[in-house]
């Protein structure tokens, strides 16, 4: 007998014994006898069943069910199924096995009514004994069975539907807790239930609705309206994570298969478009879409948005007034096309977008529109790419553009030849230039285009053909017209015709002396080198291909110049026009490979290799004073090169060494706060570091590096987060190893706590100033006692070498004080010491000078000391004012000595007129807008002729001076002035009274600061605590920097008229308290800028300190807010009240945009400002309405912005929540990671109700995803706090029912399966065991809590609740799962780092549970 038959027979026997169904005659057994026989039958069944393998058991049960399904009698079917249920109740058949076999039975079809009904009734009764994994499988089968019903259900099959509905309803029952509801929603979200019976559909819809509020707790209010500020900084992951999109769908990365709001599930086209529209956004776009340059990733979504940008530009051109003949780019639309050209070239060049697809899509759109005004601009954009790439690609790749000619140039008559004196002629001739390139490529490939040029362009074509003939362009030169540009653009791919116009263009800036070996310096004397560079208008009129040819020619010429053996190494006979033009070409990001990459990777190494120090000096000056928007990794790379360069013996020359250090100082102080960690950590943490960013010898540069690090940590909010700054330790160790030093207490107090702790760990012995004075006196006695020159040089020339103190400058100082002169032999000693070693002597001189003045009670002696130092600077040229003041500002001085140093700095700068005269002259005759000038060099020479600058005491002894093209003492002093002002701000007000005087006299120099608003922002942000009670000084700082530019910038370019009025009032007028309308105006101004309205005067963003209008708007707004005579709390509360109280004046469709803008502003302010939002949140959470909920609406309704706005409900809760979420969304990781601390300190002590807890869940829920990626520990901390708060709420109201325990538990399951796994199992289990039984039952799957254990830990607390749980629909006597078995708890990550996985992996994990 087969096992299948045996099992069926045994079931039949049990059935007979139980029902007394006998076929023989005889006395009827009594009830007890029947029961005994049934039990014996079950034991027999159990024995047989236990001996079977799992596969045999399944087959046997399957056969048994098939047998039962074949019975036509309803009662007999019921009795058979009752036997199987009883066998489950006795533990003979596992409940899961029976349910699985029932649900998978091929006979379980709704047409078999009896079998269907009885089966689902059995499942309904035994499912309580199935572990949650088995229940999940049963639910899946129920879903499939529900979908098997016809759309129209007759009364005959309604009972089957009702039985199925009961089982599904029981599975969905929250009190039954058969499996985590999180698994149910994950499963039902996968299918479409539109065609299912209304009972099932209603059941599912209601269950989904329960999870809508869970998704609400995980969603940022107005997320789809959030927009970032696009900066030209390097985009570290922690800055991009909030903005990442799927490159295929453009959708947000939302975790969990939850019913999020529809706008969150849609492609975020608005976000990508906004970013694409911003200049200098290409890196952010690549980071957002995870596009890698090294991989050829086609992004169709990006192609579509590039086409959209083109169409928008075409529409803008339709509205544009007729263009002027102005040579400069004057209209907003022209800037749009310029930016569009850059974007298109970049994304097509790296094959993220396909040129043919873009052109074809454009043709399709333009063919059905009547947009013609922008056609020339469009063809100009396409010409940029075509001219540079057509030689490397087949002609067939470009043929789609021919269709555009048909759509855009349908004229039957030729268009007139444009005026070639107008730069726009290059755009008007662009379609003809494209045609010429296509013909040339077709000719080289022997491809027949087989069509003539459009009639509209015939005259243009004839004009260019005539112009290119040798007899017509033989005398061409760069005049005021654009014929050369036209020829270059049209024939850049035709060497026969391109060489002559390009040669003429180069000759304009190079002069006739093309061969550096011919004549050397004598040629320069006989024939002056060109000084007028190519204007930006001319460069803009050239295609990218022509620009690349031009920059290649310039670099080649410079390298040949450097390699020329007849050129004196320290001289430089490069034409000023050439150098200035080269610097202007470097602003074009489209030619980056030949631009900044070529500068750092080719030109600088070749110049250095050739020891062409004059050219090297010029290039470093150019980088300091002419380069804009250079990506941070290039700047840090150059800094590393400069540190290597500084150690080379050949650069140990005063002027060159000064230039290297000055350039390095600018690079260090110019690093953006968000750039510091991203760039510096590469040089510290990577095993194969690309170089060294720490100076081996310059203490001043390393101090500046630490100050920049401090500022970065403060502004990015990482100064309190040790986890954010682990890499700093290695950097500081390297600095202290190379240049050991200490810091003044007033400076350390301004350092962020983490950096302060790291710095004070390095103990450096403090120098004895009294001993220093004795040593100087001793050296001076040695000097006066020695007469032999060789002995003097031998003794003092080794000063500063190991074992000998670097006191020679102190000696010279004392020599001048005593004798008013310097011995000629001192010059030889200075030359022997060298510029590099002299830095150590300068530090000793500063210490000695401060000690002398501090201990001098005689005012005449103080004046003598200052006069002596001035003589060393201006008369003897031993040291420079910038290096001395920098060194003096950075010395470690406390108390009276610090005050003395400030006094010395003031006297050095202002007592004599030497520096003041230079500054006044330079400021009065020059403009910082060098890109608009063609006579910079003339003014530069005039200044140096009036104020010649020497870098050595006697140039006949040393090397001859290097030619200076850009710099002077005033420009070199700017970064020093920045640092000096910061030192003043660190000390008490009584010690820094002289700062006002310095600002009065030196403030105009900020006219030439390359980042004036950024400097103000950094200063006011970093020193906010020091300046909080000094409103007059804040006003003075802002007024000085912004006022210095009043003659250069248009009105209202930065601060508002209200603030300008405040600045213009008397110094004591610091009691201005702006009203709410003022803050509304500030927010509206920035919001309008983000929306694309031209609020600020137009500017060339290529030369601006900010890359685009929204970035400019953000920083000028922050500067103004930081400069107000109002405390942080007042400003922050007013910004929050812009929405809370100003809600009626905000357009309803723009309210989320305004909240986004407020979040941007607040996140960019110091913690004392954005921290106020936690105070406002605390006020909301602790308000009486939160502790005693009297609203008719649920908390989820009042915390839903859309519902509140549409139903006009109480808005305070949700508005504060929306602003808080906006601030956190825009915050850096250093700021957002503080949320854990704020919850512990501000919220945890006051949360007693579930309404308060739900509000907190709305606050932190949306940011778990980001924290998991960047601070996984924070997710664990927040999770633990949420469980502790749940216990706190539970204990606070033990006799009250918790109305919203289900959504809270659902959120906790989301956290488990999406973030923490089993990592916190032991911590959480202890808390769960202390909760009320209803909560224990719901959370039992998190910690594998058995049903029979629920309520045990409650007995000592609440005897009445002990052992009680929610009503269960079936037997729950067995464990829901067994650890380590197939039906056990889902496999989850065991290590913290394993929880940081991508959403698809986590989704798959949930699906596999």
From Swiss-Prot:
One of its GO terms (cellular component) is transcription regulator complex. Signal peptide: none annotated. Pfam families: Med23 (PF11573). Keywords: Activator, Nucleus, Transcription, Transcription regulation. Residues 1359-1409 are annotated as: Disordered. InterPro entries: Mediator_Med23. GO terms for biological process: positive regulation of gene expression; regulation of transcription by RNA polymerase II. It is found in: Nucleus. Component of the Mediator complex, a coactivator involved in the regulated transcription of nearly all RNA polymerase II-dependent genes. Mediator functions as a bridge to convey information from gene-specific regulatory proteins to the basal RNA polymerase II transcription machinery. Mediator is recruited to promoters by direct interactions with regulatory proteins and serves as a scaffold for the assembly of a functional preinitiation complex with RNA polymerase II and the general transcription factors. Component of the Mediator complex. Belongs to the Mediator complex subunit 23 family. This is Mediator of RNA polymerase II transcription subunit 23.
